Each structure stands twice: as C-alpha cells, then as structure tokens.
Amino acid sequence: MASADRQMIGDATLAYDPRAKQKAAAKLARIPIKVEPGERLKKPDWIRVKAASPGTRFDDIKRILREHRLHTVCEEASCPNIGECFGKGTATFMIMGDKCTRRCPFCDVGHGRPDPLDQDEPMNLARTVAALALEYVVITSVDRDDLRDGGSGHFVDCIQSIRKLSPQTRIEILVPDFRGRDDRALAILQAAPPDVMNHNLETAPRLYPQARPGSDYRFSLNLLKKFKALHPTVPTKSGIMVGLGETDEEILQVMRDMRAHGIEMLTIGQYLAPSSSHLPVRRYVHPDDFRMFEQEAYRMGFSHAAVGAMVRSSYHADRQAQAAGLHVNAPK
C-alpha cells in the first residue's frame, strides 16, 4: 500500500480506508492543521448533564431509530444532552448517513467516504415522526461535498415526506454550508422551505482555520442572508460555541454580524471536547458572562436567544421557535 494511504495515530502507522468511518484520532490524523493539546481544565460546578430518568422514553427512542435505520446527531456527535432529550421523546435526526466529508476538529461526527443516499430514508423518517407524534422536528445532516446539490434535494424529500404524513408538524433544518453549491441548494429548497432555517457559524472568524478548516465565515453568513431574501417570513437561526479561545468581544462581533445579515434566532453554548484528540477547551465561560451575552442579544434585536453552558443548537428547539413567535402545538 502506498505511503499516502497510511496515517500516523500516536506511535502507530495504520492503513487508511476511506470507506471506513473514522472518529477522534483516526479522523483528525490527516487534517492540514495540528491539534495542539492544551492544559486540561477542571470542569466547573455549573456544567451539569441530566441523565435519562427511569421510566422515560430513552430506550424506546433508540429502538425506533434502529428499526427505521435512522441516525441522530445526538448520538453521532456525543451530545451531552442526549439523556434528557431522548428521555422526553425528542431527537435531532441526521440524514444522508453518518460519515461526513469534513474533518472539523471540534466535532465528534465520523469522517469517511459517504455511502450512496438511502432513497427510503425520507419516508422512514416521516413514519418515525408520525409514530412518535412529534409536533416539532429538527433535521440536520453530515456535509455531503460529494453531491452536486450538497444534499439539498434530500432535505426537500424529507420535508415533503414529513408534511405528507404529519402536516401539522413544524420542521427546522440545520444545514451545512453547501460549499460552492449554495445558489443551487437554495433554489432547490424553494420547493419545500422549512419552518426555521438554521446554519451554525460555530465560532469567531479568527478561529476558522483551526476549528472549521474548509469553511468560510462570510460564506456562512451570506448563506442565511440569501435564504432570508428568498423567504422573508421564515425565521433564520445560527449558533456559536464558546471556549475555543475566542474573546467576549469576538463573540459580540459575531452576534452583530448575524444581525447585519438578518439572522433572528441565536444559540450560544459551552464547547466540551468530545475526546483528548479534539480541540481542547480553552476556557469555561461563567454563567454571568452567558447572561451578559443574552442581554446583549436582545439589545441587538434577536427575536430569541437561547444562551447557557448546556445550550446546543437544537436543544429545546421547539421552545426556542415558540418563544420567537412560531406557533408550535403542545406535544401530544
């Protein structure tokens, strides 16, 4: 095997199989930047993860997902809120497989050569949403740079299938940046626009080369601005992680940039490193600072800001949308 097909992980040299799903060290071994480990910070008292309580729907949700061959970002990205969300019968569905074409060193979703799209996935997803009687659904995806439309057509198929079986269900999509395909993707999404359009900026532009290699801060901002121009009544949303080495002023500037590009809903949460191979946590932001970000968000004119250590983009997304003025029926 050629040397280009081998990678170093620690002191071992392993064969590289692009078809296999790579996680942690295996995933990050081939990125052009070096992840520099930092001092391991002690987790403060205000970082608390809620486990699933006995008698909740946690096991039922996992069983239904496996039966319908569905993935969730909750599982694939090792979200700390999975116990609480699954326990309450909610999940963020991740479509188009579990292998991402990007290798962002903050993210725990696996990397690899993606499998062909599952043509049954939209209807399997719709049946699952109907079976769980979900009133609000968040659909996200891995990056699919291998697809000519970036996967936008598959998003449309999923939205249309859900609306066919569950016409009252509100749908939020958390999309990738459709790098180089944004105009085509936005044109395709016009066939079935979501109820909320979400795309995360993730961090300050200074940190993009380290945190989001292959992505562009201005490109991401303009994706949401272009969508808003096409669908002025659909709320746009974006999220930021803190703790990657940014300053408070950089976060405030990202928020100003969001508002300048018409973004109405905001999430800010604490970055927690999935493993020692990922980007290290550079700081734990104090609750008082989160409150400051929240106050500033409303001063800037955001319709809703979910801000706190354990906040994630789709955490209590139904409540976020409702607080922003989108009508969401009470859960059945």
Curated annotation (Swiss-Prot):
Cofactor remark from the record: Binds 2 [4Fe-4S] clusters per subunit. One cluster is coordinated with 3 cysteines and an exchangeable S-adenosyl-L-methionine.
Domain of life assignment: Bacteria
Boundaries of every Radical SAM core domain copy: 85-303
CDD domains recorded: Radical_SAM
SUPFAM superfamilies documented for this protein: Radical SAM enzymes (SSF102114)
Gene3D superfamilies assigned to the protein according to its UniProt record, in alphabetical order: Aldolase class I (3.20.20.70)
Chain residues that bind [4Fe-4S] cluster 1: 74, 79, 85, 314
Subcellular location field: Cytoplasm
EC number annotated for this UniProt entry: 2.8.1.8
InterPro entries named among the record's database cross-references: Aldolase_TIM, Elp3/MiaA/NifB-like_rSAM, LIAS_N, Lipoyl_synth, rSAM
Residues reported in the UniProt entry to bind [4Fe-4S] cluster 2: 100, 104, 107
Reported cofactor(s): [4Fe-4S] cluster
S-adenosyl-L-methionine as UniProt keyword: yes
Coiled-coil portions: none
SMART domains (UniProt xref): Elp3
Swiss-Prot/TrEMBL keywords: 4Fe-4S, Cytoplasm, Iron, Iron-sulfur, Metal-binding, S-adenosyl-L-methionine, Transferase
GO molecular function: 4 iron, 4 sulfur cluster binding; lipoate synthase activity; metal ion binding
GO cellular component, one term: cytoplasm
PROSITE patterns named in the record: RADICAL_SAM
Chief subcellular location: cytoplasm
Keyword S-adenosyl-L-methionine applies: yes
Pathway per the UniProt entry: Protein modification; protein lipoylation via endogenous pathway; protein N(6)-(lipoyl)lysine from octanoyl-[acyl-carrier-protein]: step 2/2
Catalysis: reaction(s): [[Fe-S] cluster scaffold protein carrying a second [4Fe-4S](2+) cluster] + N(6)-octanoyl-L-lysyl-[protein] + 2 oxidized [2Fe-2S]-[ferredoxin] + 2 S-adenosyl-L-methionine + 4 H(+) = [[Fe-S] cluster scaffold protein] + N(6)-[(R)-dihydrolipoyl]-L-lysyl-[protein] + 4 Fe(3+) + 2 hydrogen sulfide + 2 5'-deoxyadenosine + 2 L-methionine + 2 reduced [2Fe-2S]-[ferredoxin]
Family membership: Belongs to the radical SAM superfamily. Lipoyl synthase family.
Protein name: Lipoyl synthase
Organism for this UniProt entry: Verminephrobacter eiseniae (strain EF01-2)
Gene giving rise to this polypeptide: lipA
